[in-house]
């Protein structure tokens, strides 16, 4: 929930302009095993929702999955030898991989300095590992973060002299139709939203909707939830009960790739 996916997309968008770029992910909750590269027939079931999202948004790059990164990297380079940059979206804890640049993401409202290791907290590595980072990026910051607040956060993070600290925020683009990306949805202060959400940390989206729409109800699912026909029936029933003439079903990009299988 630190914002790895939007950061990966930002890096892809930036790097693919000059370098042959690839992403390599574990492919969490996919139904396949081993190494695979996405093609025109690939679905979220094959590679996982986040890699599928990358594949849909950036069809010109290589999107690969593999549980063992150390094994998958040479396989990727063998099949795509022109690759110049590989972005691993969740590999900081994989010490066997010697990355050219290590980025450590930590959420503004839940800095790693205040967190604990799994299962007591959300950390996947010991706090001392932050020394391996080249850059520390504080994600999901509020838009009006002051210089004083930034300096206080930097003091808490206590970076090494060689480490740079950056601050980012989430800016939501206009929503679009699930099966027609060119068709934009018009939501605003008069809209009543049914939010379908199966991501690790929906709080930033909930805070955004609280400020920008009339009201919202949320059906919450587990992260990487695989939608079923019964889920669709529940969604339809909930939506029909909403007493509004300006209602809309809204979901995240990551959830959307898992809903596309229902396209008719």
Where would I find each of the regions flagged by the language model?
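Walker A (P-loop) phosphate-binding motif
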Residues: 1-40, 143
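Residue-level signal for inorganic ion chemistry
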Residues: 5, 54, 89, 133, ...
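Conserved beta-strand elements of the Class I
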Residues: 20-24, 104, 192-196
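Short secondary-structure boundary segments
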Residues: 25, 140, 252-254
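Phosphate/Mg2+-binding loops and adjacent switch elements
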Residues: 27-161
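Glycine-rich phosphate-binding loop signature in dinucleotide/nucleotide-binding domains
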Residues: 78-84, 239-247
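C-terminal accessory "lid"/substrate-recognition subdomains
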Residues: 111-245
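Generic C-terminus detector
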Residues: 242, 247-248, 256-264
């Amino acid at each position: 929930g630190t914002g790895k996916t939007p950061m990966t997309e930002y890096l892809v968008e930036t790097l693919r302009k000059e370098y042959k770029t690839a992403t390599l992910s574990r492919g969490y909750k996919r139904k396949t095993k081993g190494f695979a590269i996405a093609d025109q027939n690939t679905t979220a079931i094959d590679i996982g929702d986040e890699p599928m999202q990358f594949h849909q948004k950036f069809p010109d790059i290589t999107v690969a999955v593999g549980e063992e990164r150390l094994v998958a990297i040479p396989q990727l380079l063998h099949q795509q030898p022109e690759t110049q940059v590989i972005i691993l979206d969740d590999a900081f804890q994989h010490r066997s991989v010697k990355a050219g640049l290590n980025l450590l993401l930590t959420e503004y409202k839940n800095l790693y300095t205040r967190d604990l290791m799994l299962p007591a907290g959300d950390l996947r590595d010991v706090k001392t590992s932050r020394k391996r980072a080249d850059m520390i990026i504080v994600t999901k910051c509020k838009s009006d973060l002051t210089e004083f607040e930034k300096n206080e956060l930097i003091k808490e993070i206590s970076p090494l002299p060689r480490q740079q600290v950056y601050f980012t925020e989430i800016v939501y683009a206009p929503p679009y139709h699930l099966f027609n990306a060119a068709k934009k949805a018009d939501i605003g202060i008069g809209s009543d939203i049914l939010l379908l959400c199966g991501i690790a940390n929906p709080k930033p989206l909930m805070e955004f909707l609280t400020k920008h729409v009339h009201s919202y109800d949320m059906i919450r699912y587990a992260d990487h939830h695989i939608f079923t026909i019964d889920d669709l029936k529940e969604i339809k029933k909930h939506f029909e009960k909403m007493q509004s003439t300006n209602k809309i079903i809204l979901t995240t990009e990551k959830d959307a790739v898992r809903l596309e299988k229902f396209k008719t």
